């Protein structure tokens, strides 16, 4: 009986060790694949255009604000014939960000009072 028990423990130990090795190999392969994808993404990334800067060269290059991406807005200045494009935040998104910020601050106060 002792021999069967000892053999069973040895078998379980070897099985768990081999399955752990297989999982490590699998995790390493997944990690390598993910790193290669991230490197490709970083190489593709480009600089964004800050708010109120010229975005006529690439109208989709505006930076993100805290919650929303700025929009490239084009207009003709008064008395001018040239079109000017700048990255701006639409007013409704500006108000939504302010409301979200106030709600976050109010939630912090509530948590402080009752937490």
From Swiss-Prot:
UniProt keyword annotations, A-Z: Disulfide bond, Knottin, Secreted, Signal, Toxin
Major localisation: secreted
Example of a GO MF term: toxin activity
Organ and tissue specificity: Expressed by the venom gland.
Location of this chain's protein in the cell: Secreted
Signal peptide start and end residues: 1-20
Cellular-component GO terms for this entry: extracellular region
Annotated disulfide bonds: 48-63, 55-72, 62-87, 74-85
Keyword Secreted among UniProt keywords: yes
Highest taxon, organism lineage: Eukaryota
Propeptide regions on this chain: 21-44
Secreted listed as a keyword: yes
Family: Belongs to the neurotoxin 19 (CSTX) family. 01 subfamily.
Notes on the domains: The presence of a 'disulfide through disulfide knot' structurally defines this protein as a knottin.
Protein name as annotated: U3-lycotoxin-Ls1a
Species this protein is from: Lycosa singoriensis (Wolf spider)
